[in-house]
């Protein structure tokens, strides 16, 4: 069960520290408590209320069997997001956002399918029938795909929502989500426009301690939602469709992988 949100815990994590006042976005005014030494201080009571609101929505999404894609490519957030999202069994992008990740999902699916094909080759023994050089090349290709696509190898369809750390840094991802009417949950600092996302969590999005605290709270809610999952039907159907796709032209897929791997640069 997710922990109760305590304002003192948010305070200890430094969630309240905003940016310098001259960098503020006036649309964040409702979430700002005061100014101190030229820095805006976020109202943590409002932050706590917004986390509660976001968590209720995230729980429902998780309980329905749909995916929430976590996006954070800034240095201080990457490792935290990878760890927390993986613990909640949710996909994440922590390297450069692949352009068209959402709006051109068919192409992304092809890359994801390559990852799945390589994983299957390793599982069924096909990988070991390759020459040593080919195995090295295929491993290199798999590593490249993993780096570019994060943990989305099991994401067979568009996510139901995005969770973003720093909406300025991830503006391309947010624009793609907007085009497809995919709701965005986000940590929003005092220098950003909260109108760009559906679920605003006013918070310090620069300090790792603050990011860790918020991510812990939201992923606990997601894990709760998964535990109370109400319907597996949709997810099961998707799994069957993907499984059916994978057995189609298996040998051709494997040959294509080996050929592409041979062209991959070190």
UniProtKB/Swiss-Prot annotation:
Biased composition (Acidic residues): 237-247
Record's GO cellular component terms: cytosolic small ribosomal subunit
Keywords assigned by UniProt, alphabetized: Ribonucleoprotein, Ribosomal protein
GO molecular function, a single term: structural constituent of ribosome
Signal peptide region: none
Sequence intervals crossing the membrane: none
GO terms, biological process: translation
PROSITE patterns: RIBOSOMAL_S2_1, RIBOSOMAL_S2_2
Region entry Disordered, spans: 229-254
Membership in a protein family: Belongs to the universal ribosomal protein uS2 family.
Name listed for the protein in its UniProt record: Small ribosomal subunit protein uS2
Organism this protein belongs to: Flavobacterium psychrophilum (strain ATCC 49511 / DSM 21280 / CIP 103535 / JIP02/86)
């Amino acid at each position: 069960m997710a922990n109760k949100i305590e304002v003192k815990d948010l305070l200890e994590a430094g969630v309240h520290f905003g940016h310098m006042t001259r960098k503020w976005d006036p649309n964040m005014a409702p979430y700002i408590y005061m100014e101190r030494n030229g820095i805006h201080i976020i109202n943590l009571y409002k932050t706590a209320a917004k986390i509660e609101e976001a968590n209720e929505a995230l729980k429902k999404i998780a309980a329905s069997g749909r995916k929430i894609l976590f996006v954070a490519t800034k240095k201080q957030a990457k490792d935290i997001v990878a760890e927390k999202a993986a613990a909640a069994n949710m996909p994440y992008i922590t390297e450069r956002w692949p352009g068209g990740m959402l709006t051109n999902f068919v192409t992304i699916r092809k890359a994801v399918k390559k990852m799945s094909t390589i994983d299957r080759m390793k599982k069924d023994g096909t990988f070991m029938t390759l020459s040593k050089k080919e195995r090295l090349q295929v491993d290199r290709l798999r590593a490249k795909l993993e780096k570019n696509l994060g943990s989305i190898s099991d994401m067979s369809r568009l996510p139901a929502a995005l969770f973003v750390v720093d909406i300025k840094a991830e503006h391309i991802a947010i624009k793609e989500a907007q085009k497809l009417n995919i709701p965005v949950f986000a940590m929003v600092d005092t220098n950003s426009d909260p109108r760009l996302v559906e679920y605003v969590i006013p918070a310090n999005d620069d300090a790792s301690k603050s990011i860790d605290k918020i991510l812990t709270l939201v992923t606990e809610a997601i894990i709760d939602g998964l535990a109370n999952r109400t319907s597996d039907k949709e997810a099961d159907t998707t799994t069957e469709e993907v499984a059916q796709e994978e057995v189609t032209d298996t040998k051709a897929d494997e040959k294509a992988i080996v050929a592409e791997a041979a062209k991959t640069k070190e």
